[in-house]
């Protein structure tokens, strides 16, 4: 199932939220009706919060079913809210506040429950990232861009990436994430940073409200969401 929506008129959903196979975090600005619809489409428990007093949850955080990485600028109150949410939903998730100069973890790491791709900008933290997310990793960039997280969206079935990703890079991504499909595509009528526009897991996807019909078909194909 795929749902189209906006967050207060904004279609870059992946910048402002995070969704994994088992949980999700959404900005405080999302109304309850939209929140419930997204939880239903993705079939996950979710809560609303800020990270570092900001709505840029998806840019600053990265996670999978095993772990969650948040930047060092995350406040103690925000950390406690996350811990409480995880406990209330009986989620055994490694939570790590990583002390890195570049705090945009969601932009620089692409992960599912099988593997992760780490931008060269965070290469020195590779071991910690692998331990928290409990996956093996590959370090590198694709489409000549360091923002491997914001330029891709991955589930345990498939992955959609920036349209300028070359064939060798597609094979590399597929090998690391251990998925059946890796496709090139866009969202929100031509936006190449697909990770900034899409929330997805194996059960469904939520895409920016500007996403076209042909783009949705490609997303369904890449993430194996076609019934």
Curated annotation (Swiss-Prot):
| GO BP annotations, alphabetical order | cytosolic ribosome assembly
Parts of the chain that traverse the membrane: none
Q: Name one GO molecular function term.
A: translation initiation factor activity
The record's annotation in Gene3D superfamilies points to: L-arginine/glycine Amidinotransferase, Chain A (3.75.10.10)
SUPFAM superfamilies xrefs = Pentein
| Source superkingdom | Archaea
| Pfam families linked to this entry | eIF-6
- Which keywords annotate this record? Initiation factor, Protein biosynthesis
Assigned protein family = Belongs to the eIF-6 family.
Q: What does this protein do?
A: Binds to the 50S ribosomal subunit and prevents its association with the 30S ribosomal subunit to form the 70S initiation complex.
- Provide the protein name: Translation initiation factor 6
């Amino acid at each position: 199932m795929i749902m189209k929506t906006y967050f207060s008129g904004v279609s870059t959903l992946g910048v402002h939220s995070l969704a994994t196979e088992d949980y999700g975090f959404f900005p405080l600005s999302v109304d309850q009706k939209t929140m419930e619809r997204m939880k239903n489409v993705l079939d996950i428990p979710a809560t609303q919060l800020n990270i570092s007093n900001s709505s840029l949850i998806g840019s600053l955080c990265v996670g999978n079913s095993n772990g969650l990485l948040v930047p060092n600028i995350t406040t103690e109150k925000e950390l406690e809210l996350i811990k409480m949410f995880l406990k209330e939903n009986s989620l055994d998730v490694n939570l790590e506040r990583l002390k890195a100069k570049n705090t945009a973890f969601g932009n620089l790491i692409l992960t599912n429950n099988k593997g992760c791709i780490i931008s060269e900008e965070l290469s020195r933290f590779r071991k910690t990232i692998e331990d928290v997310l409990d996956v093996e990793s590959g370090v590198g960039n694709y489409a000549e861009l360091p923002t491997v997280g914001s330029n891709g969206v991955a589930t345990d079935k498939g992955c959609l990436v920036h349209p300028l990703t070359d064939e060798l890079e597609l094979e590399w991504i597929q090998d690391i994430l251990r998925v059946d499909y890796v496709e090139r595509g866009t969202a929100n009528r031509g936006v190449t940073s697909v990770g900034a526009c899409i929330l997805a897991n194996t059960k469904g996807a939520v895409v920016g409200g500007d996403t076209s019909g042909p783009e949705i078909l490609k997303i369904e194909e890449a993430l194996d969401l076609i019934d």
